[in-house]
Curated annotation (Swiss-Prot):
It comes from Bacillus phage B103. The gene is 2. The record marks 251, 380, 387 as: Probably involved in nucleotide binding selection. Belongs to the DNA polymerase type-B family. It catalyses: DNA(n) + a 2'-deoxyribonucleoside 5'-triphosphate = DNA(n+1) + diphosphate. Residues 56-66 are annotated as: Interaction with the primer terminal protein. This is DNA polymerase. The keyword Metal-binding applies. This DNA polymerase requires a protein as a primer.
Amino acid sequence: MPRKMFSCDFETTTKLDDCRVWAYGYMEIGNLDNYKIGNSLDEFMQWVMEIQADLYFHNLKFDGAFIVNWLEHHGFKWSNEGLPNTYNTIISKMGQWYMIDICFGYKGKRKLHTVIYDSLKKLPFPVKKIAKDFQLPLLKGDIDYHAERPVGHEITPEEYEYIKNDIEIIARALDIQFKQGLDRMTAGSDSLKGFKDILSTKKFNKVFPKLSLPMDKEIRRAYRGGFTWLNDKYKEKEIGEGMVFDVNSLYPSQMYSRPLPYGAPIVFQGKYEKDEQYPLYIQRIRFEFELKEGYIPTIQIKKNPFFKGNEYLKNSGAEPVELYLTNVDLELIQEHYEMYNVEYIDGFKFREKTGLFKEFIDKWTYVKTHEKGAKKQLAKLMFDSLYGKFASNPDVTGKVPYLKEDGSLGFRVGDEEYKDPVYTPMGVFITAWARFTTITAAQACYDRIIYCDTDSIHLTGTEVPEIIKDIVDPKKLGYWAHESTFKRAKYLRQKTYIQDIYAKEVDGKLIECSPDEATTTKFSVKCAGMTDTIKKKVTFDNFRVGFSSTGKPKPVQVNGGVVLVDSVFTIK
């Protein structure tokens, strides 16, 4: 008999000296009439022991702290051996919570346990967005989180409705996922499983063989993220009119149309020599460099005390640098930089194939373009979650919770643990091609480029640039969508900028439009780490380095669980 599954949620107090759950709710996924809302954590945990089901909380990092704190205070201890009256967790080194598995004992050989998962890992959006995107017949409401609610507080009708809506939105969304066969712990795992189902596991293992951990570690040194760069010319200055374009599904579009690696790599010494059987390669290279006049810098060196990890470099400084580069990245560097004292050390070369992901992407593109609501959103999720799984870090050493003397949770690093890599070369080349796409477009607009962010280019002026004029479309895979046109803007640093975007009013809402159609502007604030509450305080006058405001909730572990304490956010 399949295990029952429930969507769950806690509402908690906001005081450091009185941290507790004042309301809980659970609803069975696939049977929405089976739900309960109550006001006692003890009562909820009693149900957890009896139900032996799979539970989903949206943001387990928060709610899970209350559960683990309760378990520790009630005689349960952490163990990964499945012993009675113990619990196991999957919490990453970075503090991401994936699972809590509570073992109550055994009936014969059958383990009596309840497993708690994070629905945020399967649906990585706020509840409000899920309700809207999935076109569910519910809306996430609002309550006063800071109201006084003493122990035994009687839940008001408004609070009851709020909690019920929250658990029902997630229950409905997960039910749709499960009925589509998306039953893994994360969206990325669902996506990888979907790809294997199309290719077949046997063929997958042949095309993408398991590499040794030492080889994976070396190849991983060529793995880099998106290209995010602000042109110094426009830094901290108010700019006039401009445009933003972004690539439709940047990473899937590279997977669809670019030559990508497969099979076991061949190690080579020295400089790569042309090999038609193995045309893709990663080159380990030591060199000095100087940016050419009129070119965008593309070299970023992380985990090096001599360089800022987020800075794109104009020169190599006093010493040569050593980098692992795909042939895609190396080609860009050779175009953008003068290279000196070059030493080609060694590398890996790969077979190539275009279209490995064609069937998978075609399948989900069809769903995305022909369906609405939930199925469309699931298609987008499947679409965007696959590339990252290939480069999953095999080091899965996690954190282990324990109870500190003050009754709060602490975390220590667990024993070293590794899993097999998936196929890191694929992630390395997909991201390299993505950077190539963005950088080559930006470089062709050198006299206009303000800013790049992974899949987007921000330009001065209101003319569509020549390099993309024939590939502008709001939906086509790999084409550039015209995101917006702004009247004025100010950029301070990567992922920190404001814009007055041309807009018009339609049915009481401001819709972005061309300058010719505009009747007003829409103020947009993009700032990593800044909450919506603080964004409401931002203006063109006060938006600068040093801007500071309260309104950023900071989680603090205390006796009982977690309290979100108001803290100060500063643009540095």
